[in-house]
């Protein structure tokens, strides 16, 4: 019988001291701390504490790491309104013919019909309409800005790295550090942060050990970072995000002789979302995914997960709870806070090996 508290957002809250929110990343990348979740049959006291470099011991030859190769756009754009006031757009996703869905700040100052200019330029934009589903605005950019690849040139020149609001500083180094080392598909407005821990040295070491790497794409957007707005999780809906799971990835998973390990919640969402398009059987897929993963979900593909520590009452916390259970997750978070782990995007990591996953969550056939 499922615990009814698992389906209430208020059950996923926890107190976090402000000083535990990481403002800068670990250097080198693989030196971030890593909490290793104990097996499902063992108590919390069996948790181990190390660093991300320890993945060289935790992963075995034949294991398959699935990473998200999305690249973060410099999607935060300062614009001038016709009266001269300064506003900000967060450029989210293309809607065709140079039209882009954007979040506006302050939103009440930006209405349909308003003409904007990118600050410091003569490049004009027009607010076309409100988007009720996202709370954003549909904005007309130059028509050659039709997709992430074509708008990236403009954003690289005039945009800023869209760091999360809880990182209260600006540093030119973020242009490089807020990207994974394997990011090559532009389109995200937030980094798949678990992947930030993988240095070139760690990736090379894993390859030498015989750990394989497969690359999916999920362009991180509203579906990942938008706050959950309902306490009744049976009614939860998430904004869709664009996903590509290629035939090469499907083949790598089918021939995997070890364990399928997702790097980050976005890799989980991509793989499981693609599988749910085909009745739980993974096939190549390109398109939008809005899958909700929360306690009670039966995983089709993913066997283990490396992830960061997530915000209270977030959809990401629900996803991790689906793997190891809500009560255990919150107990682990309490332990991490007491041991001074660093939280959120630039913070430390958790390693959830397959033996730590709840039996009812394990993929069928593995």
UniProtKB/Swiss-Prot annotation:
S-adenosyl-L-methionine keyword on record: yes
Give the enzyme class: transferase
Keywords from the UniProt entry = Cytoplasm, Queuosine biosynthesis, S-adenosyl-L-methionine, Transferase
EC assignment: 2.4.99.17
Superkingdom is Bacteria
Q: Name one GO cellular component term.
A: cytoplasm
What GO annotations for molecular function exist for this entry?
A: S-adenosylmethionine:tRNA ribosyltransferase-isomerase activity
The biological pathway it contributes to is: tRNA modification; tRNA-queuosine biosynthesis
Q: Which InterPro entries match?
A: QueA, QueA_dom1, QueA_dom2, QueA_sf
Q: What is its main location?
A: cytoplasm
User: What reactions does this protein catalyze?
Assistant: 7-aminomethyl-7-carbaguanosine(34) in tRNA + S-adenosyl-L-methionine = epoxyqueuosine(34) in tRNA + adenine + L-methionine + 2 H(+)
Which chain positions lie within coiled-coil regions?
none
GO terms of biological process kind: queuosine biosynthetic process; tRNA wobble guanine modification
Alphabetized NCBIfam families for the sequence: PRK00147.1, queA
Q: How does it assemble?
A: Monomer.
Q: Which family does it belong to?
A: Belongs to the QueA family.
Task: Name the job this protein performs.
Answer: Transfers and isomerizes the ribose moiety from AdoMet to the 7-aminomethyl group of 7-deazaguanine (preQ1-tRNA) to give epoxyqueuosine (oQ-tRNA).
Q: What is this protein called?
A: S-adenosylmethionine:tRNA ribosyltransferase-isomerase
Protein species of origin:
Parasynechococcus marenigrum (strain WH8102)
Q: What is the lineage of its organism?
A: Bacteria, Bacillati, Cyanobacteriota, Cyanophyceae, Synechococcales
């Amino acid at each position: 019988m499922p615990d009814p508290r698992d389906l209430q957002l208020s059950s996923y809250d926890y107190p976090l001291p402000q000083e535990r929110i990481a403002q800068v990343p670990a250097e080198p990348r693989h030196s971030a701390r890593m909490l290793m979740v104990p097996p499902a049959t063992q108590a919390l006291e069996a948790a181990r504490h190390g660093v991300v470099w320890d993945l060289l011991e935790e992963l075995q030859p034949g294991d398959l790491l699935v990473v998200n190769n999305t690249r973060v756009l410099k999607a935060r754009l300062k614009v001038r309104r016709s009266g001269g006031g300064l506003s900000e757009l967060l450029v989210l996703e293309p809607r065709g013919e140079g039209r882009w869905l954007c979040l506006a700040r302050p939103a009440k100052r930006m209405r349909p019909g308003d003409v904007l200019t990118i600050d410091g330029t003569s490049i004009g934009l027009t607010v076309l309409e409100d988007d009720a589903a996202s709370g954003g605005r549909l904005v007309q950019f130059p028509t050659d800005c039709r997709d992430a690849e074509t708008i990236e040139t403009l954003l690289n020149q005039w945009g800023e790295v869209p760091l999360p609001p809880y990182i209260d500083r600006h540093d030119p180094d973020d242009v490089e550090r807020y990207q994974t080392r394997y990011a090559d598909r532009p389109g995200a407005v937030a980094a798949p942060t678990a992947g930030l821990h993988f240095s070139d040295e760690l990736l090379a070491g894993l390859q030498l050990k015989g750990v394989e790497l497969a690359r999916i794409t999920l362009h991180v957007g509203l579906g990942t970072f938008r706050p959950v707005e309902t306490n009744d999780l049976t009614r939860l809906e998430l904004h869709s995000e664009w996903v590509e799971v290629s035939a090469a990835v499907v083949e790598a998973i089918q021939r995997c002789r070890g364990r399928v390990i997702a790097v980050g919640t976005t890799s989980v969402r991509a793989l499981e979302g693609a599988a749910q398009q085909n009745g739980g059987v993974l096939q190549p897929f390109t398109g939008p995914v809005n899958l909700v993963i929360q306690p009670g979900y039966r995983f089709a593909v993913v066997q283990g997960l490396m992830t960061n520590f997530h915000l209270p009452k977030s959809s990401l916390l629900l996803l991790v709870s689906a793997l190891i259970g809500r009560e255990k997750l919150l107990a682990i978070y309490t332990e991490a806070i007491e041991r001074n782990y660093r939280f959120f995007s630039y913070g430390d990591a958790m390693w959830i090996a397959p033996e730590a996953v709840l039996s009812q969550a394990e993929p069928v056939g593995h």
